[in-house]
From Swiss-Prot:
This is Growth hormone variant. SUPFAM superfamilies: 4-helical cytokines. Keywords: Disulfide bond, Glycoprotein, Hormone, Phosphoprotein, Secreted, Signal. Belongs to the somatotropin/prolactin family. Coiled coil: none annotated. GO terms for cellular component: extracellular space. Expressed in the placenta. Disulfide bonds join 79-191, 208-215. One of its GO terms (biological process) is response to nutrient levels. The keyword Disulfide bond applies. Glycans are attached at residue 166.
Amino acid sequence: MAAGSRTSLLLAFGLLCLPWLQEGSAFPTIPLSRLFDNAMLRAHRLYQLAYDTYQEFEEAYILKEQKYSFLQNPQTSLCFSESIPTPSNRVKTQQKSNLELLRISLLLIQSWLEPVQLLRSVFANSLVYGASDSNVYRHLKDLEEGIQTLMWRLEDGSPRTGQIFNQSYSKFDTKSHNDDALLKNYGLLYCFRKDMDKVETFLRIVQCRSVEGSCGF
């Protein structure tokens, strides 16, 4: 084959393949509905782990008298994450914008990255499926990333690193009036369950507002 013919053939082949190459090199945009589905799955998994571990621990170690005393005492039942401003009822929650609810959810998730590792022994002795400090920490980090992605998509698309929760649990723990390790772990599990319930609720509201046909799930 002549050199000129070979060059023409290669050029024609390249032109035919160009649209496919361009399409393959482009990064497809993940649908917003899928991003919310992924975030909700992670949030629900975290809440279920928190709820099941809390129930298991309470039934195994906490007497009814201890439970009532714990819940009625504002010093023992105070959660360190309550320093994060969150809406206190349904009406106030509905008044928050989507981005506000996502930011609150992000701060709640970030607030648990340190203290959840203090529950290592509790998770290690738990019979709840998937309950280990490494699994829970990974779920928290995955959801943190998922919420940051949702904030990026719902805002203006500009890159953002997300606000980092600054108050450390260790500072709160030094002020704790609970010297009993058993009750201290119970208090952490109580707060963890409470906060993961908030996160799942806030994400569900934002999903309902943002994705058609997603309400009621």
